[in-house]
């Protein structure tokens, strides 16, 4: 039995942001890393929706929006410069212009970002909550003390000949948000930022963990809540219609075939793979199925079936 009643998953900016062409953000919609949705699905498949909460610290939430606004300004300026250069090059040979439909100036885009950010939160597919940063006097004093003494996540940064001990203020706000909101439950930060490493994974508090990918999140939750890969695949068989159709297709059933009365016979796991035997009714006939499924790759590796002899059926 887990020593925690709840787990809180916190997303850092560098994990949530989704970029294309190397470094460009999607400016017309609030797009997040596809791994975010993988984590949502994983929590459902693990049967942990009542125990795990997805959280976005408000500092991260504001930073995601600010990055969009800054990128819009930069890209708009860059495009205008290129258009002017093209006009000079082509002269009367071409008519070159660009028209913005909804966002004529920067203030329009700032309002637009607020709208698409809220649309993201309102999407039924998204189950994250925005977690406010603690603003009480004790928290502020602790953050200031950490900044003065360059205690992680603060660090000394150089600019010219000067040294600054308050680099990492944003990270400090995120950390104290996590610390306050998690309390004595399990807190997991999903981030690619190494500056957090000294504060997580037991070095600061035993209930705070850090990782940077979906598989590690799954491993932490599996260990803390005693969930096996076999358990997860069993849940998938009862909830994932696409997986059932893949199994039926591999076993050469017709496309519109339906499976009823599915019952697990045995289930064992080996690393990321699960081997499952189950029985089910197909058109009133009882079959025995054997499958191998890779949970990390979400891939059906093997599937076979045979009719169960009625004289041997349970």
What residue ranges belong to the model's regions?
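Acidic beta-strand-to-loop metal/phosphate-binding motif
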Residues: 188-192
């Amino acid at each position: 039995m887990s020593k925690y009643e709840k787990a809180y998953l916190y997303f850092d900016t560098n994990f949530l942001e989704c970029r294309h062409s190397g470094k460009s953000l999607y400016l017309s919609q609030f797009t997040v890393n596809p791994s975010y949705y993988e984590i949502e699905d994983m929590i459902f498949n693990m049967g942990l929706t009542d125990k795990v909460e997805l959280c976005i610290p408000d500092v991260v939430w504001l930073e995601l929006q600010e990055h969009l606004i800054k990128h819009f300004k930069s890209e708009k300026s860059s495009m205008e410069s290129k258009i002017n250069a093209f006009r000079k090059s082509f002269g009367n040979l071409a008519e070159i212009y660009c028209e913005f439909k909804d966002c004529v100036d920067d203030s329009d885009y700032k309002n637009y970002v607020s709208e698409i950010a809220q649309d993201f939160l309102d999407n039924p597919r998204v189950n994250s909550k925005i977690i406010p940063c603690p603003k009480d006097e004790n928290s502020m004093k602790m953050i200031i003390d950490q900044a003065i003494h360059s205690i992680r996540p603060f660090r000394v940064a150089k600019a010219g000949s000067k040294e600054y001990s308050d680099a990492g203020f944003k990270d400090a706000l995120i950390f104290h948000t996590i610390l306050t909101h998690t309390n004595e439950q399990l807190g997991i930060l999903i981030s690619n930022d190494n500056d957090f490493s000294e504060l997580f994974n037991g070095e600061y508090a035993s209930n705070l963990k850090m990782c940077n990918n979906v598989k590690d999140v799954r491993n932490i939750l599996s260990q803390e809540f005693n969930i096996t890969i076999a358990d997860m695949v069993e849940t998938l068989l009862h909830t994932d219609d696409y997986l059932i159709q893949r199994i039926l297709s591999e076993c050469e059933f017709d496309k519109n075939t339906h499976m009823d009365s599915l019952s697990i016979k045995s289930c064992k796991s080996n690393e990321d793979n699960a081997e499952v035997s189950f029985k089910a009714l197909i058109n009133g006939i009882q079959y025995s199925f054997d499958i191998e499924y890779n949970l990390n790759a979400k891939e059906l590796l093997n599937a076979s079936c045979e009719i169960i002899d009625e004289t041997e059926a349970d």
